[in-house]
Design a protein with these regions (language model features):
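Beta-strand/loop edge motif enriched in small/polar residues
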Residues: 1-281
């Protein structure tokens, strides 16, 4: 079901809108918002259960809920459960100013949320459990993640890659294979988070030869286990004094930091919040 116009689909807590399988053995396809005419859409109190993906007019939809080339869209009180066949539960590409609040995603086939080539994506109060791959996968995007729980992913809690800029605030990232991955000229700022009980809490590295550097991670007011971090030579790790005391590895730390107060994360262009790496070099 592809929507090429503005959608206002608003259920209620007692009577949510539900998309589910009519045949338990056969997955349905995708619900997609496509192109600028679908800007300013609102989806609220909706459950998506057992979908997959699809294609139309040469456009491939790799998730059961897809946002393609839209802006100023609100998703609130959404559940996505048990997608199959296609990789993602929720996919955003070529999007801007998207607000996802109070989202629950369980048992995604691969990535729970995949965000590509998008800017100013706000993710607030997410619960993502048991992802088949990553909880959140980012490519060349700017994203703010707040007040969320990302747990039991078979691969990464957050994978920030290919030039992405990401702020993660007040979020629990636990019991994943890798908690945070920063790679390929991406920067991730981690503020007031709990990142623990992952097989590896943080990995910063190069993967794609087209990018000159590895990944960059900046910790503010966070506890991190130095035995659970891997940082390649072309990556950067920096911390404020609170985090530094808990890490105890002075030779790996940047000499200076720009610090943002958590309140400054609200109502801002995300790229404007992030760190200018030239100031560390």
């Amino acid at each position: 079901m592809i929507f090429r116009g503005k959608v206002e689909a608003i259920g209620s807590t007692d009577e949510p809108i539900i998309f589910e399988r009519s045949d338990l053995n056969s997955a349905w396809g995708t619900i997609a918002l496509q192109d600028n005419a679908a800007n300013d859409s609102v989806l609220e109190n909706i459950k998506f259960i057992g979908g997959s993906g699809g294609s139309e007019y040469g456009i491939q939809y790799t998730s059961m809920l897809s946002l393609h080339n839209v802006s100023n869209v609100l998703l609130n009180e959404i559940e996505l459960i048990d997608n199959s066949i296609y990789d993602d539960a929720l996919h955003l590409v070529y999007c801007k100013n998207i607000n996802l609040s109070n989202i629950k995603i369980y048992q995604s086939y691969r990535d729970a949320i995949d965000i590509d080539l998008s800017s100013n994506i706000y993710l607030n109060n997410l619960i993502i459990k048991n992802s088949g791959n990553d909880a959140i996968d980012l490519m060349d995007s700017s994203v703010l993640v707040m007040s969320s729980l990302l747990t039991n992913s078979k691969d990464k809690g957050i994978s920030s890659g290919e030039g992405s800029n990401t702020v993660v605030y007040n979020t629990k990232i636990q019991n994943n294979n890798i908690g945070i991955a920063a790679k390929d000229s991406s920067t991730i700022a981690l503020i007031d988070n709990l990142i623990d009980s992952n097989n590896l809490d943080l990995s910063a590295y190069s993967k794609n030869w087209q990018y000159a550097n590895g990944g960059n991670a900046v910790f503010y007011n966070s506890s991190i286990n130095r035995m659970s971090i891997e940082v390649s030579k072309d990556s950067m790790l920096a911390m404020d004094s609170f985090s530094k005391k808990r890490y105890l590895a002075d030779d790996e730390l940047s000499s200076s930091l720009i610090i943002y107060k958590p309140v400054d994360l609200y109502n801002k262009e995300i790229d404007g919040l992030l760190l200018d790496l030239e100031k560390y070099k």
